[in-house]
């Protein structure tokens, strides 16, 4: 996975009076562009299930997946809950239950089921007027957000300092070491850094994960833990997000194909 990638699984709601209430679940790396494609039809890159039935509104998106594969698996399970062994307890759509309400019910159980329950996901309502409380509610480490995803920030000048403006050459051979294992951090590695002011923690992802998982030896992915440096509480998802923001690259030319593979069967 490239640093700074955005992988989201969204819920569309149809506003067309002839098809009002229909929904569509999809995957995207660019929410704003994707909803334009849906409303533009197949010729603009929209899905065949949404083509000619617009306008569509993207009302909800779940993001923070560690990879495109993880997001696509989440998308598939949300689309086919009866076929997912993780969601056999959810049950079918009830008589009189709106399609939108059913998809929210499925989502609520997905966020509480493994493997998704341990991912650093964010539940974001793009349209606050569509918001409904999920039952059961998301885990405490999954924040609830509103509005469009924040724009991608430019990479920070990690080596910038007073000397940069003075015309001095930056130091080239600085030996930066992991706070936990004391081994050197290689140039190609993106260390995790504590965001709290005054804390100098810089650590390998694996080293900090092992530190956080000491209280949960049976797990592979941490949720949160105390910073070994300043002892402040840290959410694992926040650390990963900050790490990506600091090493982000432009991906407009290498964007993943967003059309679901099942759509290809209809062409």
Swiss-Prot record:
Q: Where is this region: Disordered?
A: 139-169
Enumerate the SUPFAM superfamilies for this protein.
GIY-YIG endonuclease (SSF82771)
Q: Which InterPro entries match?
A: GIY-YIG_endonuc (IPR000305), GIY-YIG_endonuc_sf (IPR035901), Slx1 (IPR027520), SLX1_C (IPR048749), SLX1_endonuclease (IPR050381), Znf_RING/FYVE/PHD (IPR013083)
**Among its keywords, does the record have Transcription regulation?**
no
Q: Which UniProt keywords apply?
A: DNA damage, DNA recombination, DNA repair, Endonuclease, Hydrolase, Metal-binding, Nuclease, Nucleus, Zinc, Zinc-finger
The SLX1-type zinc finger ranges are 178-230
Q: Does the keyword Protein biosynthesis apply?
A: no
The EC number(s) this enzyme carries: 3.1.-.-
Pro residues bias: start-end ranges: 139-157
Q: Extract one GO cellular component term from the record.
A: Slx1-Slx4 complex
The text of the family note is: Belongs to the SLX1 family.
* Chain's role: Catalytic subunit of the SLX1-SLX4 structure-specific endonuclease that resolves DNA secondary structures generated during DNA repair and recombination. Has endonuclease activity towards branched DNA substrates, introducing single-strand cuts in duplex DNA close to junctions with ss-DNA. Has a preference for 5'-flap structures, and promotes symmetrical cleavage of static and migrating Holliday junctions (HJs). Resolves HJs by generating two pairs of ligatable, nicked duplex products.
Q: Could you give the subunit structure recorded for this chain? A: Forms a heterodimer with SLX4.
Protein name per the record: Structure-specific endonuclease subunit SLX1
Q: Which organism is it from?
A: Bos taurus
